[in-house]
Design a protein with these regions (language model features):
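Structural register within alpha-helical repeat arrays
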Residues: 39-40, 74, 108
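Residue at a conserved register position within TPR or TPR-like alpha-solenoid repeats
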Residues: 43-44, 78, 112
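Canonical positions in the second alpha-helix
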Residues: 60, 93-94
Length: 114
């Protein structure tokens, strides 16, 4: 068993962040997968860097416009930013793509009750 089991995850995240920075700056024509974007968004969200997380989410949605998971992340971040009407817009878009995700209805409730 590895002495540092989380080192691989940290190294992977560091590489993803570098890849995103290069892509954003136009220095790379690399491809970032949808789940990798989700990891980057979660990283900024956990650090309470909501503006940065929203920026990554916008870029990710431009690459994956039919991803209900990314639309839900965007709505969640908007709710955290107290932008409830915008959040509801993205929740409605996500609902068109996936009506079975329970997080959709939890976030809708949060937005309406706020």
């Amino acid at each position: 068993m590895s002495k540092y089991p989380y080192r691989k995850d940290r190294d992977e995240l560091k590489e993803l962040l570098q890849q995103y920075d290069n892509l954003k700056a136009g220095r790379s024509h690399s491809f970032i997968e949808e789940d990798s974007f989700e990891k980057i968004i979660d990283y900024f969200d956990e650090k309470d860097e909501i503006a940065q997380a929203l920026e990554v989410t916008d870029y990710a949605i431009s690459q994956y416009p039919y991803s209900s998971a990314l639309l839900l992340k965007k709505a969640d971040l908007l709710i955290a930013s107290k932008k409830y009407k915008q959040a509801l817009y993205f929740l409605e878009e996500a609902e068109l793509l996936d009506t079975t995700d329970i997080d959709l209805y939890i976030l809708k409730t949060d937005a309406y009750l706020a």
